[in-house]
């Protein structure tokens, strides 16, 4: 079926209207796979709930990789002033839908030279990276293009790595009037030290080369015999 069988904006709008937080991508994967089939691609959902597509039969293997999960929280889907708003419009259902239509528009000559694999990966926004880990040993492309928001006016050649840290401090419980710092205070001091280290490393560095830190969660569990404090941060 020709590329005109689906309207790109309406197709993306439909994908945005299907909630797909990490771990719950099956419905949107099925929607995207069905759309790929309508566009004449081989569309399917794999064992990791990735939305998959394939076109061409050439020797040069190309992977167009995006992700279809989102962070939690809904943004009302709306088309306003020529812009489409919704959770995942930019990160990253929008880029993946653009890749789908690009693949569907390949010429017959290109299809003879290339085999293009589309992967709308699951759990990219989660530490598990389930979808990418599933396809990594199964696809060996000559070229890979990643669909992530990075500005439309250029091509991003690399991304920084990310370290997720869960820190936990546990110690014997004592009265609040005691002079010794409690578990929560010690954990706060630890994060303050991390900040100081990062800021010292960042002096004179361009943004890409800086160590960026974010405190994502901090919890103090009710004290009984032991004090327990936990925090999650990333670098």
Map each language-model feature to its residues.
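Acidic/histidine-rich catalytic neighborhood of metal-dependent amide-processing enzymes
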Residues: 97-164
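Acidic-enriched catalytic cores of C-N bond-cleaving enzymes acting on peptides and small amides
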Residues: 176-232
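Hydrophobic/proline-rich hinge and linker segments of small-molecule sensing/allosteric domains
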Residues: 162-175
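Acidic/His- and Gly-rich active-site-bordering loop/insert found
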Residues: 1-89, 111, 169
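Short, conserved micro-motifs enriched in small and acidic residues
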Residues: 85-97, 181-184
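Short beta-strand/turn micro-motifs at beta-sheet edges
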Residues: 74-75, 153-157, 219-225
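Predominant activation on well-ordered alpha-helical scaffold segments within soluble catalytic domains
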Residues: 13, 33, 97-104, 133-136, ...
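Buried hydrophobic positions in well-ordered alpha/beta secondary-structure cores of metabolic enzymes
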Residues: 19, 36, 53, 64-67, ...
């Amino acid at each position: 079926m020709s590329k005109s069988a689906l309207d790109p904006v309406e197709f993306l709008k439909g994908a945005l209207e299907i909630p797909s937080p990490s771990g719950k991508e099956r419905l949107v994967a099925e929607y995207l796979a069905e759309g790929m089939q309508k566009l004449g691609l081989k569309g399917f959902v794999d064992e990791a709930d990735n939305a998959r597509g394939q076109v061409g039969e050439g020797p040069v293997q190309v992977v167009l990789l995006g992700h279809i999960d989102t962070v939690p929280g809904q943004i009302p889907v709306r088309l306003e002033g020529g812009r489409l708003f919704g959770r995942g419009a930019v990160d990253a259902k929008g880029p993946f839908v653009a890749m789908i239509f690009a693949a569907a528009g390949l010429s017959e000559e290109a299809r003879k030279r290339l085999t293009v694999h589309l992967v709308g990966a699951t759990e990219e926004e989660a530490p598990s990276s389930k979808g990418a880990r599933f396809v990594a040993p199964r696809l060996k492309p000559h070229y890979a293009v990643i669909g992530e928001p990075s500005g439309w006016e250029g091509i991003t050649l690399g991304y920084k790595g990310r370290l997720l840290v869960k820190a936990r401090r546990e110690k014997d419980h004592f009265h609040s009037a005691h002079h010794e710092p409690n578990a929560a205070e010690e954990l706060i001091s630890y994060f303050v030290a991390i900040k100081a280290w990062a800021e010292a490393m960042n002096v004179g560095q361009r943004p890409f080369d800086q160590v960026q830190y974010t405190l994502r969660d901090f919890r103090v569990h009710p004290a009984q015999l032991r004090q327990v404090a936990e925090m999650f941060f990333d670098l």
